[in-house]
Amino acid sequence: MQFQFTKLSLASETEMMLLDGDMTTRYGQSSAVGITVALSGDAFRTRLEKNGALVMDHTMLGFESSVTTTIAGHTASRNYTLSTSSPSVRDLYVVVKTITPLVYGADANPVSGSILVTGAASSVTITAVDAASVRLDLSARGDGVITETRTMPWRELEQSL
């Protein structure tokens, strides 16, 4: 199923979200408990304002995302380029690529899997250690040579974003 949004707005008294872009959705069922949902598109923009002020403005380019759910949990894979800005982050441009799909059990955090996030001059590989911890491997020059490694609770990573 294909969708094309042109300035679709969702609004409340204090917030407004604007959606622009294209998205293709695919759905598959391999068994009674095995379901896959995939989203893809060339460009999709989400802009959020609160009381007239910009909260965030994200554009995903060349995106692919899929989630497979079974009775045991689910796996997720994402690949996209993100261009974003907000009052706290100006003109961030990163490429996100799944190295190995993130595997989730009963918890909200993945128990395994890794993704690579590449910016202008550096990259970080984010690897799920378990449902409680995540490891960050920083390549300061973005050449794959690890210059710093840090393991932390998922909550700490989430709060830093």
What spans do the regions from the language model cover?
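Low-complexity, intrinsically disordered segments exposed to solvent
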Residues: 1-161
